Amino acid sequence: MAHGPAAVDSDARERVLDAAERLFAERGYVGVTLRDIAAEVGIRHTSLYHHVPGGKEELFVEVTERHLARHREGLGRAVAGAGPEVRAQLHAVADWLLSQPPMDIVRMIYSDMPKIAPAQAERLSMAAFASLLAPIDAVLRGAEGRGEVAPRNLGLAAGGLLAMVESVYAIPEGVIATSGRSRREAAHELIDILLDGLYPR
């Protein structure tokens, strides 16, 4: 195992990325300063430029892309391991999403993106689509091809499903505790409602 300067530098950079990802996820781009990240890691804020010369924006883009890549890989594994039926696949999607810190896509679009360069905002928008919406859309289109779901606006349904699952994070702990069901069970029920509809059968 390497213990030289390069390994130490790599470990330090990884700590910076981990701290930045956590803080940006909690507070958004505007709510985090380089001093906050440096304090979390235990270094001077000027030392951050050694690891990310582009400063706060470069750091935000890098850790957001890293977070999204983890979603893309995780959703792919979840769907692949769920079997061929759409309900099981979407339940697996919900389980993966709820196992990760919430993305807060609405805040990202309306608060974070306007504060960074347009090219970087577009880059993150494309990454978010590829990592979050495209995998769910692929599940629904596969189900359409097998005759499990009707040929509707599946892209819209994918976005709605993602938003529904993310909204489960907003349910207060007290409500979850008194409801007698977990967030996972609540997300599964939302998916079942989406698939089965509210009309009586």
List PLM regions with ranges.
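N-terminal intrinsically disordered/low-complexity leader segments
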Residues: 1-11, 201
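Amphipathic, non-transmembrane alpha-helical scaffold segments
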Residues: 9, 17, 60, 64, ...
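Helix-turn-helix
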Residues: 12-15, 19-58, 62
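Amphipathic alpha-helical interface segments
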Residues: 19, 23, 96, 164-171
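Short alpha-helical functional segments enriched in proximate histidine and acidic residues
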Residues: 23, 70, 74, 78, ...
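Short coil/turn segments at alpha/beta junctions that flank glycine-rich nucleotide-binding fingerprints
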Residues: 26-30, 82, 146-147
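Hydrophobic alpha-helical connector segments
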Residues: 62, 73-105, 157-161, 187
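Hydrophobic/aromatic-rich alpha-helical bundle segments in the mid-to-C-terminal region
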Residues: 103-118, 122-126, 130-133, 141-192, ...
